[in-house]
């Protein structure tokens, strides 16, 4: 490598010496129409030596000799221009103060020399790039022919990477929807209308690379257009990573709130001692990561799953001096009290819960004990140990619940919010499904596709709301930041998604139209439509994605008695109905 660099330096240095001397000679020759009077020979030779030293010096200063052929760009051309301009300026100053030494000397030769030397030195360096660019390219066996969608700077970067062979792609054309760009050049390609994709598909091209920055709705529309044209492999080019990645279902479905407020969350968490229950779950682990990200002083991670706790502890191992993993069930009040007395958290983020509807239907007693009694024990212990704020993660399934899980979460809302007072601020945050959470529909579909199995869903009309887990958790923390105590916050999850449409899109993205979709029938307690969430009577907050739902406190003595009854009753569904009158238990499914 050192030899190669030395060889390159020697080549460029030798070439530049020849070209600089040649440009001085040609400058004089052009000035005198090819016949240089002998009287000017002295001035020409002196100026050639001085200009040679000055130009080489400035080219070294601007690090031009460290640039390889293939990395020569407009930026390097600009540096050469400035280096040569400064060299000519310094020569002019020398000439101005020591003109007698040069006389006679034609001043116009300075300008001509500058133009020629820039042309020669720049052309030398760009020559290899030009040869590579204009050399007819042939597709290698391992490369995939593709269409580039979007005549942008991203596209130019993509085309450059493809030429260098770093992407495994072989672009055959560039298309764009903007009429003003049609017929212009993007690299060596003439930009064509999107409709041209049809003819490329007929020629066997099945891959499209999106080189545009698009909003989600625009991306969804473009994806559908590309599929309609016959494209079966859609990728998005990442400029920062210099790679073309597969478009994902998350790109097409996830709601991405525009009112995420990092500063508010940082102010809320910075230098605080925070306890997260259910720390190893999908929501809990993201809460832990964001607590560390936004400057929590100490994070206590509580979970009763050894594996989940190990996983999040390992993920945050770089911050081990700031985290404490506690393997503990929140049903163990004595141990929980010891933890709170030892670490004195100022904030508890309660994410521990059983969340899977079918399992809770089959194990209603366990759902009641874990969700309701566990929440009650944690909330009571927090208040007794003077924790300042308690934020509980709730669910859209708590709205007019039809299943045991949703109803237990509604009871948790009633209990925790009724415990709120001026010394113990409690808030609950409801939201829908997060993309990729354990046991949810998207990982299930991905596994079925990987195993060549049909995609199963319970009803063709079933719909759900989706949000990326990181965005949902940040909105939870923003809600916690603005909570004064007693609020039932609701997150705007965007538009509902039909699960059958989700299944079809995932098959398209996987190029697996050979797999079928099977309808299995609604399960016990399952809703067709989650009744999320935003009601016209809900109060707005400073964030457009966060609302406050109406909620009434209940008599705690009465609620405590009903919770005691839940633990010993024979019919849990009936006992829950006494607490939550709007509970309409779908025991049979469809």
UniProtKB/Swiss-Prot annotation:
Residues bound to substrate: 355, 433, 441, 458, 523, 526
Protein name as annotated: UDP-N-acetyl-alpha-D-glucosamine C6 dehydratase
Binding-site list for NADP(+): 280-283, 303-308, 329-330, 351, 355, 393-394, 409, 434-438
GO cellular component annotations of the record: membrane
Major subcellular site: membrane
Catalytic activity: UDP-N-acetyl-alpha-D-glucosamine = UDP-2-acetamido-2,6-dideoxy-alpha-D-xylo-hex-4-ulose + H2O
Example GO BP: protein glycosylation
Topological category with respect to the lipid bilayer: Multi-pass membrane protein
Main function: C6 dehydratase involved in the bacillosamine biosynthesis pathway by generating UDP-2-acetamido-2,6-dideoxy-alpha-D-xylo-4-hexulose from UDP-N-acetyl-alpha-D-glucosamine. Involved in the N-linked protein glycosylation pathway.
Keyword Transmembrane helix: yes
Gene: pglF
EC class (word): lyase
CDD domains: UDP_invert_4-6DH_SDR_e
Bilayer-crossing regions: 9-29, 42-62, 80-100, 101-121
